[in-house]
Regions:
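Membrane-embedded alpha-helical segments of transport systems
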Residues: 100-108, 130-155, 326-342
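Alpha-helical transmembrane bundle and helix-membrane interface signal
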Residues: 117-128, 133, 146-149, 156-165
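Short helix-loop-helix connector
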Residues: 85-86, 122-124, 255, 300, ...
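Hydrophobic, aromatic-rich membrane-embedded alpha-helical segments
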Residues: 95-122
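Transmembrane alpha-helix interface/packing and boundary motifs in multi-pass membrane proteins
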Residues: 100-109, 272-293
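Membrane-interface alpha-helices at helix entry/exit sites of multi-pass transporters
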Residues: 91-94, 111-114, 125-139, 307, ...
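Predominantly cytoplasmic-facing regulatory/coupling regions of multi-pass membrane proteins
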Residues: 1-99, 156-282, 312-313, 320, ...
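Re-entrant/interfacial helical elements at transmembrane boundaries that shape
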Residues: 113-122, 285-302
Length: 367
């Protein structure tokens, strides 16, 4: 056998392996790296003691209970979008898809959204590109909301961030130089132009397939403009993000340190931590583990008393970080455990639903 005949297959496997490493290796490395950096600056034994002895788990339970509401609301909201492309799954199926997405993302970051689109398309025998497009529209709507929340937070609660700039000028300079770099924006513009040119003028089956795929995505996204129930969709969006905030807010009462920060500074502490953790969840990682705690502790530090500054009292600063880590790790661990256990139940229900459908389709018809 000519060894050259295996070369394309070998290259395909290499590409597949590289793709898997990018999809799963990078998010895992981010989660592990941030957790290692986090635990390096805290007293782990003291953190565990705080969780065991000081945490009021009733508020953590309330946090988890409130967390179920956004899943129900998101399922209802996506159902409105799917109706616009004539896809009408039962509500329980939408709930399975949304809950399964969160569970899927714990193990396979960023693939949960692809999975839910594929699941709905397969079960409802609908075109995948259009269902995927409606999902993209769903996530883009969330991106717009996050951007608006971020702007509002910076506009009305800029004092803590100004404090950060004065405390860490080097970090601010690095971020500013990156955002204003012509090389960064030029590279992004060049990549966009190349992609547009390939899709516009390229030929071949692959390019044609990609073009049709994006056409389906656009049709799913454009369906929002003509869908019925826009008012209900906007109301559900407001409820969704209000519940996300309420979920974090009630968790602040679970620990003495976070409760005291709320009492001293007001609800703005929770608002800023909510905004930062929401942005952090966009970083590819396993269920937000790593970025979530890092963003939460950073937000808490913005309101830390001067007496716990690292330059003034290193021991007190470490104790503050440890208490913040206890808070962040408890919240993310409880949510992750819920998604794992709930995900197992949901996937069992999906399997049972599939068996019922297969049995119904195989059953002989009686005339």
């Amino acid at each position: 056998m000519n060894p050259d005949t295996n070369q394309p297959t070998n290259e395909l496997h290499k590409g597949s392996l590289a793709s898997k490493l990018l999809k799963f290796g990078i998010p895992l490395a981010i989660s592990v790296g941030l957790c290692v950096a986090l635990f390096r600056d805290i007293d782990f034994k003291e953190m565990m003691r705080i969780i065991r002895e000081e945490c009021n788990f009733w508020f953590i339970g309330l946090n988890l209970l409130i967390g179920l509401i956004p899943i129900v609301v998101r399922a209802a909201r996506w159902g409105i979008q799917l109706k616009a492309i004539n896809v009408r799954p039962p509500f329980r199926i939408l709930f399975y898809a949304i809950f399964g997405t969160y569970s899927f993302n714990v193990v396979f970051p960023r693939l949960g959204e692809v999975w839910r689109s594929g699941y709905i398309a397969y079960r409802q025998k609908a075109p995948f590109p259009e269902v995927f497009g409606s999902m993209i529209a769903d996530r883009l709507a969330d991106t717009v909301v996050v951007a608006l929340l971020t702007l509002l937070t910076f506009a009305f609660a800029s004092a803590p961030f100004i404090k950060f700039v004065h405390t860490y000028p080097d970090a601010y300079d690095k971020i500013a130089s990156l955002l204003t770099s012509p090389w960064v924006w030029g590279g992004l513009a060049a990549a966009a132009i190349v992609c547009w040119a390939l899709l516009r003028f390229g030929k071949g089956k692959f390019i044609s397939g990609v073009r049709n795929f994006f056409k389906g995505i656009w049709e799913g996204f454009a369906a929002i403009a003509k869908m019925d129930g826009k008012g209900k969709w906007l109301l559900l969006t407001a409820i969704l993000w209000s519940c996300y905030f309420l979920q974090l807010y009630v968790a602040f009462f679970a620990f003495p340190m976070t409760r005291e920060l709320l009492e001293a500074n007001g609800i703005i502490v929770a608002i800023i931590c909510y905004m930062l953790t929401t942005i952090a969840m966009g970083i590819p990682s396993n269920g937000g583990i790593g970025p979530y705690q890092t963003a939460l502790i950073f937000g808490l530090q913005l309101f830390a008393p001067a007496a716990v500054s690292a330059s003034v009292n290193p021991a007190a600063h470490k104790a503050f970080l440890t208490a913040g880590a206890a808070f962040g790790n408890t919240v993310i661990a409880a949510q992750t455990l819920t998604f794992i256990i709930g995900g197992i139940i949901v996937f069992l229900l999906i399997a049972a639903d599939r068996r019922r459908n297969e049995a119904a389709s195989d059953a002989p018809s009686h005339k």
